Design a protein with these regions (language model features):
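Conserved AAA+/SF3 P-loop NTPase catalytic/coupling segment centered on the Walker-B
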Residues: 159-182, 214-221
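Intein modules and their embedded homing endonuclease domains
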Residues: 1-67, 73, 103
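Positively charged interface segments
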Residues: 145-146, 193-194, 220-223, 229-247, ...
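AAA+/SF3 P-loop NTPase mechanochemical coupling elements
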Residues: 150-156, 190-208
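P-loop NTPase catalytic core of nucleic-acid-dependent motor ATPases
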Residues: 46-162, 174, 225, 229, ...
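Positively charged, polyanion-binding regions of nucleic-acid-associated proteins
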Residues: 286-318, 326
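Conserved catalytic/switch belt of AAA+ P-loop NTPases
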Residues: 175-197
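Phosphate-sensing "switch" segment of ASCE/P-loop ATPases
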Residues: 199-202, 217-286, 290-291
Length: 373
């Protein structure tokens, strides 16, 4: 209040008349004591569900555009043939995922869309579509730290965010914080000069990058839906001119109307179709010990010197633990695996047991079964 009063100190308003003449007050002081001043005893919230309470001030101001009947085929073609590379199953999921985020902006996304593609392929254009719909409640984050570290007051009124050229793989702390941001219904709001405050989170997230390894994806990953964006329109300025005319014109309003009417009553966003990009992210996210196991399984060779293939030596179903430890040690040196990520003999034995269901003796299964595992 004091800062606001200082700002308006030179702005006066007539509040009455005395014998000596008109009386004046500072704008803020006059407003504070006015009988028609609106008072919100319930405080300030951000709730896109549209709750109306005269005692609560809701920071959600609604969508940025109004729906309009008509065709949105330009935008739909972009989503199907560029974002989803023509895959109908992926396209159906993305449409319902977008419809959910638009129809239920009050709900946390729970699944982040991950788009990997070459520069100029159109990855960021999806963000422009959502920016037109959500307006000030949309954010483009050009620094991953804006999402996972430091002050984050900018996220309080955000329902849809795009993390541009963001890579979250390889940093356990950052990866863990990101997963929490995607699924947690609350977040700790940190503002400079204020205590940390727990507030509801409404965030739905898209991550875009041209890096090979973007996210740490586990074998049973359910927080990400990764897609490789098609490069078919790179350099086609006419295509993107037409697309942006649609986004900045009335067609986006037609798309908004379609999304608001889209049937998602039976849509489970946590059940996603398989994608090649998910398998790629999972392979790149394997722990070094699992990467080593994949390497020897694919090579059919468990010998310590990984680079000297001996074609005449058959796959051995029985190998000594010493040989396996030696083989893994060579792999760690060749790949420059950090000490933190290395496993000892006992941990390696436990990993083999968990993969191949063997106890006491660490026998490898036949080559085909090992590759399958």
């Amino acid at each position: 209040i004091s800062a606001c009063r200082d700002l308006m100190r030179n702005q006066m308003i007539q509040t009455g008349v005395k014998a000596s003449g008109a009386t004046y007050k500072n704008h803020l002081d006059a407003w504070m004591v006015h009988s028609d001043r609106r008072t919100y005893k319930g405080g300030v919230i951000f709730d896109p569900s549209g709750v109306e309470d005269p005692d609560i001030y809701n920071l959600w101001s609604g969508y940025a555009i109004e729906p309009l009947p008509g065709s949105c085929k330009t935008i739909l073609r972009f989503l199907r043939h560029v974002i989803c590379s023509g895959n109908k199953q992926h396209y159906d999921y993305v449409l319902k995922w977008l419809a959910r985020s638009i129809q239920r902006p009050q709900d946390i996304g729970e699944v982040a869309l991950v788009l990997r593609g070459k520069k100029g392929s159109g990855k960021t254009t999806l963000g422009e579509i959502m920016r037109r719909i959500f307006g000030n409640n949309y954010l483009l984050l050009d620094d991953p730290n804006l999402l996972t570290r430091g002050f984050n007051a900018h996220l309080r009124e955000c329902v849809f965010a795009v993390a541009d050229e963001a890579v979250f793989a390889g940093d356990k702390r950052t990866s863990g914080k990101l997963k929490s941001q995607i699924t947690s219904t609350t977040m700790n709001l940190e503002r400079k000069g204020f205590d940390v405050e727990t507030v509801p989170s409404r965030l739905t997230l898209v991550i875009i990058s041209n890096d090979d390894h973007i996210i740490d994806a586990t074998g049973d990953e359910r927080r990400y839906f990764p897609l490789e964006v098609s490069d078919q329109s790179i350099g086609d300025t006419g295509y993107f001119d037409d697309l942006y005319k649609a986004i900045n014109g009335d067609e986006i309003r037609c798309f908004f109307r379609m999304m608001m009417a889209f049937d998602i009553s039976e849509f489970n966003h946590r059940v996603m179709p398989n994608t090649d990009e998910m398998r790629q992210q999972q392979a790149l996210s394997l722990r070094p010990v699992d990467q080593w196991l994949c390497e020897i399984g694919c090579r059919g060779d468990v010998y310590p010197n990984l680079w000297d293939l001996v074609e005449s030596d058959p796959w051995q179903e029985e190998v000594s633990m010493d040989l396996l430890v030696s083989s893994m040690s060579v792999y760690n040196r060749e790949k420059k695996v950090s000490t933190y990520d290395m496993v000892n003999r006992q941990q390696l034995g436990g990993r083999l047991v968990s993969m191949f269901s063997k106890t006491r003796m660490h026998n490898l299964p036949v080559e085909a079964a090992c590759k399958e595992a």
